[in-house]
């Protein structure tokens, strides 16, 4: 029985690894950029419009967790006329758990990045909480690369899911000028006793005090009604802060009924794109 269970576990792990590796190459244009900030090579999946013209200007969407949900993004963008002039850039994770938590978790949220508390041996700041470095890679290396190889307009979106959603909120809070649209699907904003929620509220509050220099921003947040209570609580906290302080931010949020954590980002893609397109027109 033990041998059979071990074999079954091995097969299950092999299937998971295969699915991950199968998505480490895309059906689009794959490029590799050496990052001096991260001191590693980073692969990027690029979806160019079907009628791409080198001298034409295009909108830009950058999304984290580039290994995940790429097919859904492709199919939705193919159906929406407004997205025919958009370049989609997906940044895959190097290794699912380690570099994902390292790259996407904000530096002020280094504790308890799972729905169950980490044991002390796995709670080292070296393991996660370096979103500032990942953002520096996007700002200082990826965006300049894209701007030097493609003509881009001013419509730029950052999208993320779960830990990537907390990264979206972190980016919007610290360097809001990098993008004019932000999508946070099932954002894991509950980290460290809702630290991400609190920091986002602080950003909104400070922004509301001085509106003269604010650039136009739009934000779309979703969560599934069947997700973990911590996720739903964080979602409620974000909504509360937006209702109080949002002022000039164009935003909307949605609870997708009956959807769990892995299901919500699939449904959210079209919802977010429709919202963004309406907000800039």
Task: Locate predicted features.
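Membrane-water interface of alpha-helical transmembrane segments
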Residues: 1-2, 257
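Non-catalytic cap/lid and distal C-terminal segments of serine-dependent acyl enzymes
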Residues: 17-281
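Hydrophobic membrane-insertion alpha-helices, especially the h-region
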Residues: 2-16
